[in-house]
């Protein structure tokens, strides 16, 4: 890191404060030991299901695969009390097929990764054109990636300016800003990137942990750093920012631990799919299995539930 970058980081941390890493780890360790009563557990499982962005982001995606994903999103279970998921998440080229499969006013939104996902390594003009194309084809939400190289070089104004340009390109579509926490490496960097994004986002736009394409994705630790940043930003500005951990959350047990973290850090106002999401696919089937177990007392075999894509 250059001397200029060091100076930029020092100035930012003087504004927002560093992360207490020991405190973060102590807090997240407690979330894993919480016991949940039966009624609360069933509520939490259904809530988590309603927060899923059901995702397929593979090179072998086809219109037929996306249509199947959309059917899973609309009808995750034969149990009428199980909610639909929050959204499906697909590549920009698949948005029109998702819109065709979902129709209008179903309650399931269409999210699309854009801005040269997952690397972000394309000219800004190209990235913005991809955003506009996805929105024109029917995307309700855009998941963008930040310029990690610029961030790590201390070029914070460039990072913010690019996010602000994507906000404008989104129009009325919700924006989710992916930090790619594995490449940021430290909790301090994750907090700093969160603040840079939040300062140019609109109420209920999102910050998001990961693309799901690297070795380290969402953890209770990096989720905690980001939701504490959201809390601090909200207390300072009154602007509510939403959160999406993505990648690596595959079990109902994990999802409930993340929801405990949200409740204890941000409160009940964030316990809805407007302000909290899970970027996942395999998670949904485990949630459905656990819901069935709570309802009937018996586990269903994994093949009982239709398969969604397993890319996250």
Report the location of each language-model feature.
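A short, histidine- and acid-enriched strand-loop-helix "catalytic/donor-clamping" loop
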Residues: 57
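Alpha/beta enzyme core
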Residues: 39-49, 60-83, 93-243, 250-281, ...
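Charged, compositionally biased N-terminal leader segments and the immediate start
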Residues: 1-48
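N-terminal beta-loop-helix "entrance" segment that forms/cooperates
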Residues: 286
